[in-house]
Amino acid sequence: MNEWTPIAKKYDPLKAGSIDGTDEEPHDRAVLRAMLSRYVPNKGVTGDPHLTLFVSRLSPQTTEEKLKEVFSRYGDIKRIRLVRDFITGFSKGYAFIEYKQENAIMKAHRDANKLVIDQREVFVDFELERNLKGWIPRRFGGGFGGKKESGQLRFGGRDRPFRKPINLPVFPHQFNSESRGEKRHRSRSRDRSHDWRGQRRDYGRDRDRGIRRPEKERPYTKDDKEQNAEHTKRERSREQAKNDKDKEKKDSKRERSRERDYRKHRSDEHNR
């Protein structure tokens, strides 16, 4: 627990679907399937992974031309790869779109998610296969959480910081060490740390609203365990409901911050 960070340094399917990244047991069969899977990234894939967008939940009728028509509104496209079945040639329902400029991919990531194309609401995120060590695709049970309707603890599917665990104390030296460590994370980690700091403040408010700590030591009973489990369940439900309510309001501000920090990060890399 002391090594908890809001940003995943490598992909762990057990923690990927968790709200706070502290789960110790798989909560559904998809997570278990991902834990047992072994995925080797395609080394034949070309292009800049930091300028590549992942688009899924596409209609079988959606073509490369349709994708170009829709996504070219955000900027100049360098390459589109609609993944097809090797035997039948039919679309597998997902594609990769590489842009020429950083501001184009940031704009598409911000505005194109949940866009309706050919009567299907699509899912859009940055490519993670070449950017996150140990990545397991959703078709093998991986990814970052499914739909809310599927009962996932951490739904939405997009790469984002974990919520701070309610039983994790915060000390100044830990905060400083975490901040220094985040600077060494993969591309786009800085902007996600801003979200973590905001969520830290949310955690403080939740704690003020009712988390009580024992005044003195006493034996830990079965009733205590059941009460703690029920309390944790209520807190998770409350945070999940609050996250739903605030998501739309925070998205715009979050993406603007992401775009500024990501552009600065890429500029620093080019100057090295």
Swiss-Prot record:
Q: Which UniProt keywords apply?
A: Coiled coil, Nucleus, RNA-binding
Task: From the Swiss-Prot or TrEMBL record, state where the protein is found.
Answer: Nucleus
**One Gene Ontology molecular-function label:** snRNA binding
Q: Which Pfam families match?
A: RRM_1
Principal location: nucleus
Q: Where is the RRM domain?
A: 51-129
What GO cellular component is one of the record's annotations?
Answer: U12-type spliceosomal complex
* Compositional bias annotation for Basic and acidic residues: 146-162, 190-272
Q: Which PANTHER family does the UniProt entry name for this protein?
A: U1 SMALL NUCLEAR RIBONUCLEOPROTEIN 70 KD (PTHR13952), U11_U12 SMALL NUCLEAR RIBONUCLEOPROTEIN 35 KDA PROTEIN (PTHR13952:SF6)
- Protein's name in the database: U11/U12 small nuclear ribonucleoprotein 35 kDa protein
Organism lineage reads as:
Eukaryota, Metazoa, Chordata, Craniata, Vertebrata
* Protein's gene: snrnp35
